[in-house]
């Protein structure tokens, strides 16, 4: 099953994920993958996430949390945050494990 590591930018989620899953297929910067698929290619965020989960059932997904903080003025930036949030909700639902990373320390939330 999928494992999701999420945290703020530069909080160490990629290092922790790779340390805990050295042999697994990893997808770092998944928030940027969502940006390309949804905003550039016009895919719907949840549909993209469902397809991804079906195609990569044992993946280690690593993403930045982008939904906290000040709401961007730019509509495209707001759409990006919304798409990432919706897609990661699907991934988290499908995941066997969800770990939130702060200062390099993982806290398992699922």
Which ranges hold each PLM region?
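Generic detector of leucine side chains in alpha-helical contexts
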Residues: 4, 16, 39, 73, ...
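Short, flexible loop segments at the rims of nucleotide/cofactor-binding pockets, characterized by
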Residues: 3-9, 38-40, 76-78
């Amino acid at each position: 099953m999928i494992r999701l590591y999420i945290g703020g930018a530069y909080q160490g989620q990629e290092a922790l994920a790779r340390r805990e899953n050295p042999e697994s297929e990893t997808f770092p910067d998944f928030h940027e993958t969502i940006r390309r698929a949804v905003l550039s290619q016009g895919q719907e965020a949840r549909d993209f996430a469902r397809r991804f989960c079906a195609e990569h059932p044992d993946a280690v997904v690593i993403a930045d949390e982008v939904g906290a903080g000040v709401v961007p003025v730019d509509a495209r930036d707001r759409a990006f945050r919304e798409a990432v949030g919706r897609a990661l909700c699907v991934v988290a639902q499908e995941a066997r494990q969800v770990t939130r990373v702060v200062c390099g320390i993982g806290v398992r939330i699922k």
